[in-house]
Amino acid sequence: MVTEWIQLLIFLFALLIFSPLFGLGLYKVYLYKTSGFEKFLYKICGIDPNRNMDWKEYALSLLVFNFFGFLLLFLILFFQNYLPLNPENFPGLVWDLAFNTAVSFATNTNWQAYSGESTLSFFSQMAGLTTQNFLSATTGLCVLLALSRGISVNYNVFALGNFWKDMIRGTLYVLLPLSFIFALFLVGFGVVQTFSESVSAITLEGNTQIIPLGPVASQVAIKQLGTNGGGYFGVNASHPFENPSPISNFLQMFSILILPGACVFLYGRITGSIRHAWAIFSVMFTILCVGILIVWTFESSWNPISGTLGFWEGKEIRFGILNSSIWEVATTVASNGSVNSMHDSFSPIGGLVGILNIQLREIVFGGVGAGMYGMILFVLLTVFLSGIMVGRSPEYLGKKIEKREIQMSILGILLPSTIILLFTAISVSVSDALSSLTNRGPHGLSEILYAFSSGAGNNGSAFAGLNANTTYYNVMIAIAMILGRFGVILPVLVIAGSLAQKKRSEIVSEGSFSTEGGTFYILLLSVIIIVGALTFFPVLTIGPILEHFIMFQNLTF
C-alpha cells in the first residue's frame, strides 16, 4: 500500500512540475522565428503566414481542413483492399463503419467500433489514423491559440492569427518531435514497431495462435500525446504489445495529461496572467485527485458478487488496481479514451466517475487545446454569475463580458449535454439500439449513456458490452461526435472574435472580480459541479447509482 501511495504521489508531482515547463515550451514555439523549412512549406502550400484572420475566416479554414481530412480518411478505409501495406489482405470497411471511424479520428474522438489488428491494414493505421491523430490534436491547439489572442488584443478583429500557420507550427514543432522521441522510448521498453506480417505460433495446448504485429509504437506515441486514444489493438493499452511493462504504463499515463496541462500555462502566458492559469490548473488538479481517490477506493473495496476484496475482473494483474484507477480517471478527464483495463467491468461507482468525467465536457485537462478552451466557457459563466451577484458589469482579464459571450458560452456548454441525453433517450426507445445490449437493467442503460457521452465528449472510450458496430450506432455516434466537436469549437471562435474587437483595460477596478484567488477557485469548482454534473444526476441515479445499491443484493447484469 505504501508503494502504491508513493507511485501516485510521483505521478501527480511530475504532472505538477512539468505542466508549466511544457507550457513555456509551447509558448516559445509560437514566438519562434520562422525557419527555412517552414518558409518552404508556406511557399509550396501558397500560405501567407503574415496574413491574420478574423474569426469567420479562421473557422472556415478549420472546417474545410477538417472536412477534407475526414474525406481522405474515409476513402482510405473504404478502399483499403486496393491500397499498399496490406499483408493480411483485409477488405475495405463497410460504409457506415468507415464513416464512423473517419469522423471519430477527424474529431479527436477515436471511438473504435472494430478491432484494429483484425480489420485495418498497416497503411490504414499509419497513413489514415495516425495522420489524423496529429491533425485533430493540432486543431484543438489552434482554437485555443485563437481564443487566447482574442482576449489579449485591443480593438483588432484580425488578430486571431493564421490557422494554416498555427497548424503547421503545432504539428512541426510540437507533436512530431515529441512523438518521435516518445516512440523511441516506447520501443526501448518493449512496444512493437515492425512491418512484419502476423506470426503463427503453437500454444502449450497444441492449438495454433495468430499473433498480430505492426507499427504500434509510432501510433501509441501520438495517440497518447495528442489525447486521441485509439489503439492499434482492440484491447488498446491492455495489450502487451502496446503497453508491456509498468514503466511503459507510467509513461503513457503521464503523456495523456502533460500537453493538456501545458495548454493551461500556454493560455496564461499569451493572456499575460500566469496566476490565473494556476487557479484554473488547481481546479483541474483537484478534480483529478478526487476522482483517482474515489475510483481507487471503490475498486479496492469488497466485491459482494464475487465475495473477494477488489474488483479485479477486466484488469491486468501486472498493472493492478491503482494503475487501472489512475488510467481510467486520466483517460476520461482528458479526451483520450485509451484504456489499460475494461471500464465495463469496473464497480458501479468506479464506472460512474469515468462517465461523469466525460460529461463534464472534457474540461478537466481535456484534449490538447480543447480542454482549456472548454474550461474558459465555464470561467466566463463563473465571472458573469459573480458579476451579477455583486451588481457589477462582469469583466474577464480586462475585457467586458456581455450578452454575446454568455450566449455562446451557454451554447457550448449545453449542446453536448443535450446531445448525450437526447440520443440516449432515443436509443432506449429503439429496438435496433436495444438489440446491441449484452447487459440489461441499469448497467445496460449505463452502456448506452457511456457511448453517447463518449461520442459527444470526443473521448472514445466505451463500456464494451455494447455492440456498437451496427448501422444505427455507427451513424448516431458519428453525428454525436461531429456536434460535440464543432458545436463547441464554433461558439469558442465567435467568443474569440467578439472579445478581439473590445478594449482590454489594464486597470483593475475596485469592483472587479479577481480570477486568481481562492474565491474564484471555489466559485469555478461550484459552477462546474452545479452546471456540469447535476445536469446528468437524474439519469445517473437510474444507471450506475442504482446498480451500486442493487449489487449488495447479490444482483448483477
From Swiss-Prot:
Stored InterPro entries: KdpA
Single GO BP term: potassium ion transmembrane transport
Keyword annotations of the record: Cell inner membrane, Cell membrane, Ion transport, Membrane, Potassium, Potassium transport, Transmembrane, Transmembrane helix, Transport
One Gene Ontology MF term: potassium ion binding
Membrane-topology descriptor: Multi-pass membrane protein
Annotated transmembrane regions: 6-26, 59-79, 127-147, 172-192, 247-267, 278-298, 363-383, 410-430, 475-495, 520-540
UniProt key word rRNA processing: no
One Pfam family linked to the record: KdpA
Subcellular location as annotated: Cell inner membrane
Gene Ontology terms: cellular component: plasma membrane
Subunit details: The system is composed of three essential subunits: KdpA, KdpB and KdpC.
Record's function text: Part of the high-affinity ATP-driven potassium transport (or Kdp) system, which catalyzes the hydrolysis of ATP coupled with the electrogenic transport of potassium into the cytoplasm. This subunit binds the periplasmic potassium ions and delivers the ions to the membrane domain of KdpB through an intramembrane tunnel.
PANTHER family, alphabetized: POTASSIUM-TRANSPORTING ATPASE A CHAIN (PTHR30607), POTASSIUM-TRANSPORTING ATPASE POTASSIUM-BINDING SUBUNIT (PTHR30607:SF2)
The family this protein is said to belong to: Belongs to the KdpA family.
NCBIfam families per UniProt: kdpA
Annotated protein name in UniProt: Potassium-transporting ATPase potassium-binding subunit
Organism: Leptospira interrogans serogroup Icterohaemorrhagiae serovar Lai (strain 56601)
